[in-house]
Swiss-Prot record:
EC number per UniProt: 1.12.98.3
Source taxonomy: Archaea, Methanobacteriati, Methanobacteriota, Stenosarchaea group, Methanomicrobia
One term under GO cellular component: plasma membrane
Protein name: F420 non-reducing hydrogenase I large subunit
Organism of origin: Methanosarcina mazei (strain ATCC BAA-159 / DSM 3647 / Goe1 / Go1 / JCM 11833 / OCM 88) (Methanosarcina frisia)
Residues where Ni(2+) binds: 61, 64, 569, 572
Residues that bind Mg(2+): 42, 575
Gene that produces this protein: vhoA
Statement: the UniProt record of this protein carries the keyword Cytoplasm: no
Entry's induction text: Expressed in methanol-grown cells.
C-alpha cells in the first residue's frame, strides 16, 4: 500500500489536503479530506446589527460574495418578516446578480481551475501511441486548455485558446455585476426587503450589450452547435432520452466528419462542450460512439454505496412574482429545492433534517450532530491537537461534517440539475447507472456545470430583457422591532452548491448566534459521528489515481480531477491559518 498525499490541492479556493492509501493497481482504498484553516465569521457576527450580515458575510469569499450576501439577505427577510412582500423587480434583480456571479464562477472553474488538468502529460502518454487520431486529440487538449507559464519536459507550452479567451469574459461578467450592484467583489446593493439601486433603462441596455459579447465567447469556444438549438434539444427536451439522443447523434455526425481528416478543431464543429462530451466518457466515447480511446472520467469520482450519499439542493432563483416563502423553496424557485437519493429517487427537502457533526473535526463542541440554528463554533486552541496525519479514526479537518437526515450530501451543479430533472444531465446519469457506472462521477459533475452555465445564459436574457421592469418598486420598509428575539433562515444556491445561513437575535435585536453551512463543508467534509466519509472521500475510495494508462504515484491526475471536480471553496468553509508552523504541510506539490 502506498500513501499518496496532495498537500495542498492547488487551483481551488483555499487550502485543502487530500491523503489517500493506494494499492498496487492504483485503486484508492482509504482517503481523508482535510481543510487546513479555521473560519471565524460566525463569531465576528455576534453582537452586531443583523443588517450587517448581508455585507460582512460577503467577505467570507471573494469568488462568490453575492451568494453569501443573498443568503444572508434571505435570512434577514425572514428575520424582519418581509419575505412575503419583497417586490418582484427586487427578486428579479437578485436573480440577475446571482446568475452573473454563478456564470463567472463556473467559467473560472471550467477553464482556469479544472481544464488545465486535461493538458497533463499523463494523457499524452496514452493518446499519442494511437496514431494520427490520438495525436490530433492530444494537440486539441493542449492547444485549448494549457495554462499560462506551462512547461512540458522543460519546453514552454503556449497557453490554450479557450483558457486565454475565458479570462476577459470573467472580467466582463464582473463588470456587469458592478454596474447594477455597486461593485464586485463585495457589492453594496443588497438589503433585506429588496435591494438598494433602481437599475435604469441605460443600465439594462448596457447589460444587454455585455450579454451579446458573452454569447460571442460561448459560440466561439464553448458550444459550436447553435445555442438556441442546444437549449431547445437539451434543457427544453421533452424527456431525458431525447436529450441524450440529440447529443449522441450530434457527436456521431461530428465524428463521421472528423475521423478521416483527424480534425477535431472548433472550426470543424468541436466546441469545448462537444469535445469533452465525446472524449471525457468511456461509456459515451468508446462504447456508444466507437472512439478508440477516452479519458474515462466516468470511471472515477463515483460512489460505491448509494445508501451513503444523496444530492441536496436548497433551491435558487426566484420566480418573477412579489414575495416568496423562505421556508418552502420548492414552490417559488426556478431551481427547486429537493433531495435525490444515491439510487436517483426523488425526495422532498426538509431543512429540519440538516445537522453538523464535529466528531472528526478540530472543534470542542459540547454536543455533536447539532442543527445549524443551534450550531456551535468552538475550535481547538491547543496546537498539539491539530494534527492532519492521524488517519480516518482521528480528528483531521477544520471542516465540520454537514449531513442530511444522517447522510452525506453532494451539492452543486450536479445536485441542482438532478433535482430540477434537467433532461440532459438526468439522462446521462440514468444511462450511466443502467450500464454499471456510478451516475455521479467526474464526467457528469463537469458536464452538469457546463450545462448549468448554458442554462444561466438562457435565463439571464429573460431576467434582463423581459422580467425586470425599470422604474418598478424595489424594496419595502423594515420594522426593526420584528428582529428582537427572532430567528431567520436563508437557503440559497451558490455556484458550488447549497448555502445556508441561520441567524438568531436577542432582546436588543442584536445577533446572538450566526451559523453558515457552505457548499465546501458539504463536499469536502470529514467523516461524521457514524464514521461515514464525506462526498469527496467517498468518491476517492474505489477510484483509480490514474483513470487511463499506467499507475503513476508521482502524477495522480485522477486525484486532481476528483478533488477539483467539486470546485471546492475552502475559503468559504474555514478561515484562520495555523501560525505556529507546527502543522505546516510536509509535502508541497504545485500542480
Amino acid at each position: 500500500m502506498v500513501n499518496v498525499t496532495v498537500d495542498p490541492l492547488t487551483r481551488i479556493e483555499g487550502h485543502q489536503r487530500i491523503s489517500t492509501e493506494v494499492d498496487a493497481n492504483g485503486v484508492i482504498t482509504d482517503a481523508q479530506s482535510s481543510s487546513l484553516i479555521f473560519r471565524g465569521f460566525e463569531r465576528i457576527l455576534q453582537h452586531q446589527d443583523p443588517r450587517d450580515a448581508a455585507f460582512l458575510t460577503q467577505r467570507i469569499c471573494g469568488v462568490c460574495p453575492l451568494s453569501h450576501g443573498l443568503t444572508a439577505t434571505n435570512a434577514l427577510d425572514e428575520l424582519y418578516g418581509v419575505a412575503e412582500h419583497v417586490p418582484k423587480d427586487a427578486l428579479v434583480m437578485r436573480n440577475i446578480f446571482q446568475g452573473l456571479n454563478m456564470a463567472a464562477s463556473h467559467a473560472t472553474h471550467i477553464y482556469v481551475l479544472w481544464a488545465p488538468d486535461l493538458a497533463n502529460p499523463a494523457y499524452k502518454k496514452v493518446l499519442t501511441p494511437l496514431g494520427d487520431t490520438g495525436n490530433a486529440v492530444w494537440d486539441e487538449m493542449l492547444g485549448r486548455f494549457a495554462p499560462i507559464s506551462y512547461k512540458m519536459d522543460g519546453v514552454p507550452i503556449p497557453a490554450g485558446s479557450s483558457y486565454l479567451a475565458a479570462i476577459p469574459e470573467k472580467k466582463r461578467l464582473q463588470e456587469m455585476i458592478a454596474l447594477i450592484a455597486g461593485r464586485m467583489p463585495g457589492p453594496s446593493a443588497l438589503y433585506p426587503g429588496g435591494y438598494t439601486y433602481p437599475a435604469t433603462v441605460a443600465d439594462i441596455t448596457k447589460l444587454s450589450t455585455y450579454y451579446l459579447q458573452i454569447m460571442d465567447f460561448i459560440s466561439a469556444h464553448t458550444l459550436r452547435v447553435p445555442f438556441d438549438t442546444w437549449i431547445e434539444n437539451t434543457y427544453k427536451a421533452s424527456s431525458p432520452t431525447k436529450a441524450v439522443s440529440f447529443v449522441t447523434e450530434h457527436l456521431t455526425d461530428l465524428i463521421n466528419k472528423s475521423t478521416t481528416s483527424n480534425d477535431f478543431s472548433k472550426e470543424a464543429g468541436w466546441g469545448d462542450t462537444e469535445f469533452y462530451a465525446a472524449f471525457g466518457s468511456e461509456l459515451v466515447g468508446e462504447k456508444l460512439l466507437g472512439l478508440p480511446a477516452s479519458l474515462k472520467h466516468d470511471t472515477i469520482g463515483g460512489y460505491q454505496d448509494p445508501s451513503k450519499i444523496c444530492f441536496v439542493a436548497y433551491g435558487g432563483y426566484y420566480k418573477p412574482t412579489d414575495g416568496y416563502d423562505p421556508r418552502s423553496p420548492a414552490g417559488d424557485r426556478i431551481f427547486t429545492s429537493g433531495v435525490v437519493s444515491g439510487n436517483l429517487e426523488y425526495l422532498k427537502f426538509d431543512p429540519d433534517k440538516i445537522t453538523e457533526s464535529t466528531a472528526h473535526s478540530f472543534y470542542q463542541n459540547s454536543v455533536n450532530d447539532l442543527p445549524p440554528v443551534k450550531g456551535e463554533t468552538v475550535p481547538f486552541t491547543d496546537p498539539e491537537k491539530i494534527v492532519y496525519t492521524g488517519g480516518s479514526d482521528s480528528q483531521y479537518s477544520w471542516d465540520k461534517a454537514p449531513r442530511y437526515d444522517g447522510i452525506a450530501g453532494e451539492v452543486g451543479p450536479l445536485a441542482r440539475m438532478l433535482n430540477i430533472k434537467e433532461p440532459l444531465v438526468t439522462g446521462l446519469a440514468l444511462a450511466l447507472a443502467e450500464n454499471g457506472y456510478s451516475p455521479a462521477n467526474v464526467y457528469t459533475r463537469m458536464l452538469a456545470r457546463i450545462q448549468e452555465t448554458a442554462i444561466l445564459a438562457y435565463e439571464l436574457l429573460n431576467w434582463v430583457t423581459v422580467d425586470y421592469e425599470p422604474g418598478g418598486k424595489i424594496s419595502v420598509p423594515l420594522d426593526f422591532n420584528a428582529a428582537k428575539d427572532s430567528q431567520g433562515m436563508g437557503l440559497w444556491e451558490a455556484p458550488r452548491g447549497a448555502l445556508g445561513h441561520w441567524i438568531s437575535t436577542n432582546g436588543s435585536g442584536k445577533v446572538a448566534n450566526y451559523q453558515c453551512i457552505v457548499p465546501g463543508s458539504w463536499l469536502m467534509s470529514p467523516r461524521d459521528s457514524n464514521g461515514i466519509p464525506g462526498p469527496l472521500e467517498q468518491s476517492l475510495i474505489g477510484s483509480k489515481i490514474n483513470p487511463v494508462g499506467e499507475v503513476d504515484y508521482t502524477n495522480p491526475v485522477g486525484i486532481f480531477h476528483m478533488g477539483r471536480s467539486y470546485d471546492p471553496c475552502i475559503s468559504c468553509a474555514v478561515h484562520t491559518i495555523d501560525l505556529t508552523g507546527k502543522c505546516a504541510p510536509n509535502t508541497l506539490r504545485i500542480l
